[in-house]
């Protein structure tokens, strides 16, 4: 088993511009809580730090849309999300806010340290400016047509339809979201962080963890490293945010870019936790003691911010220092996405189940269990209402809950509510469970972040316990062999205790209720003590002969009836109907043919057969492929938004149709010398137009 002096767990900061949904819970906050609760159960010294990201354009956009101040927005959603997390049993030691004075001071301190070392560069660049609103426009304040998929509603930073990361300058027909006016380009000065300067150090850092980190984290990070790291802007022209600690005209109106600001929240929140604990310097033991292990729980869309950018900021601080050096993360267990009824969660389309809404209707532990059993560890998973119902009814109610209630009720009715006899170490083996091996497997699963495996292990014990009680038939045996029935019940009651411990990280409120029904004075929460392992109690029976149970049991899990799910299924039906209606409109709109052109105009379009020689994915563009095409005697580079439909490997050797005389464009610093043709099906899938025949490469389409 792994032992360290102390462990710091951080969780990605959710934007305080809306409520968190089940996708957020599954990807970041529940896995972190499962890990933290297990480590506490082992007696490890561990703290869990989280908080709200309260700066950035999403906040100001929401404020302007609602006609309120950014402060009103973040106050509302910080409180709402913290309340939802608390009700769900997410056990933060501290949940902070990036608008706090401590955080502002910490972020400015980091900026000043790096600025004083002369590491930042200043660059004048062109940025869109809205004359009507009299302000520079950051990327999310601009909308326009995507140059990749022609989506007319692409944002200045990304097209949601094709997933391509964009810059505002790449949009076709850009418009300001503030005034709907066409913005003009003006020069503005920004500070840049020299990410490329730390390329070698970051490569060594990632290499040192390649056996421990998940493959998706390693692969995505190495893709960025392979393509070379560039300077990244750390300032924006905004009024809401952390102002630069510089008294110069150039710094006026500038705030820290949220990617630089937010990750430093982990440090400032730990400082606030230490101060709240009455030991203001205690935070250093978690950030500046090499014997502390740090784990950053994130979703897969935040990988490079935590494997490259945050470490680089800490490296910049550490450069040239002999004291107050910061630790880098030991692991960054990024989850894949959890979808909802087969589709991606989307706040913009309101296709989501919000955590607060869910907890008004169903118990938190049922949700925690269902998500843990569907944890998106190495691939995307799915939350469905029917699966939630089946797991609640079949596994939690019929298996676990049924066993606990039967054991306690029978003991209360036939043995005066007392453990009827001792359960010896030899008898503890009777159900067929190797407790030493179970403890080792449980530890290995949790320490490796295999939460589905750890949860399944607990439910397997519940199934074994249920089967043991059913096959032992104490209600029959007691008629002729009271001692034999007593032995069965002593074992069963101790199994109840062990199940509470094993499943505590997943269903903590239920685990404490089980111990209360068993008449145990201290809840598991009250037994947790740094340096003392509670989970090791499963190795031996804990309930002695004569121990008094609580007189009345309770139903741990109420089964979910079809009628309770009907409103939720109706919501999905309505949302899907709206989606189909929108898609139908788009399809109908697509049948409106373009304006007529003359034959001579058509002849101006030079369509050629090209063959794919090489194909690679583009960094920061989830749906973009870079193709090297052979067109007769020439070689062309073309970017195509088909990565979700064709892999690079299957593209090589294909014949495609190239618009050969299309003016070249620069997209994400890559040249695209033309366009290849594809057809979009009704389900959004793209199909390449693939000509076949011998010796047709370079030939013109007629």
From Swiss-Prot:
It is an enzyme of class 6 (ligase). It is found in: Cytoplasm. GO terms for molecular function: ATP binding; metal ion binding; methionine-tRNA ligase activity; tRNA binding. Residues 601-702 form the tRNA-binding domain. A motif ('HIGH' region) lies at residues 14-24. Binds 1 zinc ion per subunit. It comes from the Bacteria. A motif ('KMSKS' region) lies at residues 344-348. It catalyses: tRNA(Met) + L-methionine + ATP = L-methionyl-tRNA(Met) + AMP + diphosphate. The keyword Membrane does not apply. Disulfide bonds: none annotated. Zn(2+) binds at residues 146, 149, 159, 162. InterPro entries: aa-tRNA-synth_I_CS, Anticodon_Met, Met-tRNA-synth_bsu_C, Met-tRNA_ligase_1, Met-tRNA_synth, Methionyl/Leucyl_tRNA_Synth, MetRS_core, MetRS_Zn. Its cofactor is Zn(2+). HAMAP family: Met_tRNA_synth_type1. This is Methionine--tRNA ligase. It comes from Chlorobium phaeobacteroides (strain DSM 266 / SMG 266 / 2430). The lineage of its organism: Bacteria, Pseudomonadati, Chlorobiota, Chlorobiia, Chlorobiales. The gene is metG.
């Amino acid at each position: 088993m792994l032992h360290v002096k102390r462990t710091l767990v951080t969780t990605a900061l959710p934007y305080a511009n809306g409520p968190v949904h089940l996708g957020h819970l599954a990807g970041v906050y529940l896995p972190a809580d499962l890990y933290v609760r297990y480590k506490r159960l082992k007696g490890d010294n561990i703290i869990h730090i989280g908080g709200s990201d309260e700066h950035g354009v999403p906040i100001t956009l929401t404020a302007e849309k609602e006609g309120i101040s950014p402060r009103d927005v973040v106050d509302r959603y910080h409180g709402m999300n913290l309340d939802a997390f608390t009700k769900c049993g997410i056990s933060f030691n501290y949940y902070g806010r990036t608008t706090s004075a401590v955080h502002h001071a910490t972020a400015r301190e980091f900026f000043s340290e790096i600025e004083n070392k002369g590491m930042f560069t200043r660059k004048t660049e062109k940025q869109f400016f809205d004359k009507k609103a009299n302000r520079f426009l950051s990327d999310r304040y601009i909308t326009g047509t995507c140059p990749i998929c022609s989506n007319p509603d692409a944002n200045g930073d990304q097209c949601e339809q094709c997933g391509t990361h964009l810059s505002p300058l790449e949009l076709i027909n850009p418009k300001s979201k503030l005034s709907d006016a066409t913005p003009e380009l003006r020069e503005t000065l920004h500070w840049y962080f020299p990410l490329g300067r730390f390329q070698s150090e970051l490569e060594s850092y990632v290499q040192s963890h390649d056996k421990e980190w998940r493959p998706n984290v390693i692969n995505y990070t190495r893709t960025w490293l392979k393509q070379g790291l560039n300077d990244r802007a750390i300032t924006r022209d905004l009024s809401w945010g952390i102002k630069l600690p510089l008294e110069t005209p150039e710094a006026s109106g500038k705030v820290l870019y949220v990617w630089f600001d937010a990750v430093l929240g982990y440090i400032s929140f730990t400082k606030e936790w230490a101060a709240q604990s009455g030991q203001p310097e205690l935070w250093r033991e978690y950030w500046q003691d090499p014997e502390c292990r740090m784990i950053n729980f994130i979703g897969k869309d935040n990988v490079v911010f935590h494997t490259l950018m945050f470490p680089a900021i800490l490296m910049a601080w550490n450069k040239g220092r002999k004291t107050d050096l910061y630790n880098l993360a030991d692991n960054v267990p990024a989850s894949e996405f959890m979808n909802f009824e087969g589709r991606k969660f989307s706040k913009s389309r309101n296709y989501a189940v919000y955590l607060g809404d869910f907890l008004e209707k169903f118990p938190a532990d049922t949700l925690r269990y269902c998500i843990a059993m569907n944890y998106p560890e190495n691939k995307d998973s799915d939350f469905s209402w029917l699966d939630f119902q089946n797991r609640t009814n079949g596994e939690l109610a019929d298996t676990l809950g049924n066993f606990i209630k039967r054991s306690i009720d029978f003991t209360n009715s036939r043995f005066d509510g007392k453990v009827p006899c001792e359960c010896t170490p030899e008898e503890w083996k009777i159900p067929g469970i190797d407790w030493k091996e179970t403890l080792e497997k449980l530890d290995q699963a949790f320490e490796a972040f295999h939460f589905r495996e750890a949860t399944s292990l607990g439910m397997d014990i519940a199934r074994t316990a249920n089967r043991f009680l059913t096959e032992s038939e104490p209600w029959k045996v007691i008629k002729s062999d009271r001692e034999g029935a007593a032995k069965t019940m002593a074992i069963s009651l101790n199994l109840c205790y062990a199940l509470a411990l094993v499943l505590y990280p997943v269903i903590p409120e239920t685990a404490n209720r089980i111990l209360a029904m068993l008449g145990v004075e201290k809840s598991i929460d009250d037994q947790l003590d740094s340096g003392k392992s509670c989970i090791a109690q499963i190795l031996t029976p804990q309930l002695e002969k004569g121990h008094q149970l609580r007189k009345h049991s309770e139903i741990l899990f109420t089964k979910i009836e079809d009628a309770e799910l009907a409103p939720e299924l109706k919501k999905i039906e309505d949302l899907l109907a709206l989606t189909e209606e929108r898609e139908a409109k788009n399809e109908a709109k697509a049948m409106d043919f373009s304006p007529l052109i003359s034959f001579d105009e058509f002849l101006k379009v030079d369509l050629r057969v090209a063959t794919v020689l090489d194909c690679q994915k583009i960094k920061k563009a989830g749906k973009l492929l870079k193709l090297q095409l052979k067109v007769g005697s020439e070689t062309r580079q073309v970017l195509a938004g088909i990565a979700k439909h064709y892999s690079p490997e299957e593209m090589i050797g294909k014949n495609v149709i190239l618009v050969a005389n299309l003016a070249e464009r620069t997209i994400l610093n890559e040249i695209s010398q033309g366009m290849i043709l594809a057809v979009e099906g009704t389900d959004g899938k793209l199909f390449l137009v693939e000509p076949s025949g011998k010796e047709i490469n370079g030939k013109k389409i007629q």
